[in-house]
Amino acid sequence: MDPYIEDRDIQKRSHYKVLGVVPTCNDLDIKSAYKEMLLAHHPDKNGNASTTINSIQEAYKTLIDPELRDQYDDSLKRSIQRQGFNITGDGLDIYCLDDFEMEEEEECKWLKDCPRCQFPKSIKFKESDLIENGTEDGDNGFDIIVQCESCSLWIKVKYYEINEEDDE
């Protein structure tokens, strides 16, 4: 389990939501929001506040420290991926062939543990799948969309054709 994120709390109470800021905010935005939230939720002014001073302070300490914020953002992304939420804007998480384990039998195949359900090697495809089902991506590469065999997660895999001339 990630140290900062409980899966059940992801969407309702992220540190960004506690302070009322967006993930792209800067330190000045964080400091300003922190002061506003402390004043708005101070027990003397608002005894029924749903946001506690402790959660405001924890959010501030995490987001104001660049290293802690990076760790928090990484854990937030991993937690969101486990739940299968869209983080790329087109509805699919994007991976590259290097993210997969390659097995060479009669035909090359690529395998990956599902980032959502964590089932081992449940996302898989073969070289023939790349040839038959890959589509050009407009950036001199190709995409293929594959599904986990254990859950409903679909992902996009980016890959590039290797020219034999480049290898010589």
From Swiss-Prot:
DPH-type MB domain residues: 91-160
Keyword terms of this UniProt record: Cytoplasm, Iron, Metal-binding, Nucleus, Zinc
One Pfam family matching this protein: Zn_ribbon_CSL
Pathway given in the UniProt record: Protein modification; peptidyl-diphthamide biosynthesis
Stated name of the protein: Diphthamide biosynthesis protein 4
Binding, Zn(2+): C114, C117, C148, C151
Name of encoding gene: DPH4
InterPro entries named in the record: DnaJ_C/III_chloroplastic, DnaJ_domain, DPH_MB_dom, DPH_MB_sf, J_dom_sf
Localisation: Cytoplasm; Nucleus
Record-level GO cellular component terms: cytoplasm; nucleus
Single biological process term from Gene Ontology: protein histidyl modification to diphthamide
Family, similarity comment: Belongs to the DPH4 family.
Main subcellular location: cytoplasm
Domain J stretches: 14-76
Keyword Iron listed: yes
Domain of life: Eukaryota
A Gene Ontology molecular function term of the record: metal ion binding
UniProt remark on domains: The DPH-type metal-binding (MB) domain can bind either zinc or iron ions.
Gene source species: Debaryomyces hansenii (strain ATCC 36239 / CBS 767 / BCRC 21394 / JCM 1990 / NBRC 0083 / IGC 2968)
Function: Required for the first step of diphthamide biosynthesis, the transfer of 3-amino-3-carboxypropyl from S-adenosyl-L-methionine to a histidine residue. Diphthamide is a post-translational modification of histidine which occurs in elongation factor 2.
Lineage: Eukaryota, Fungi, Dikarya, Ascomycota, Saccharomycotina
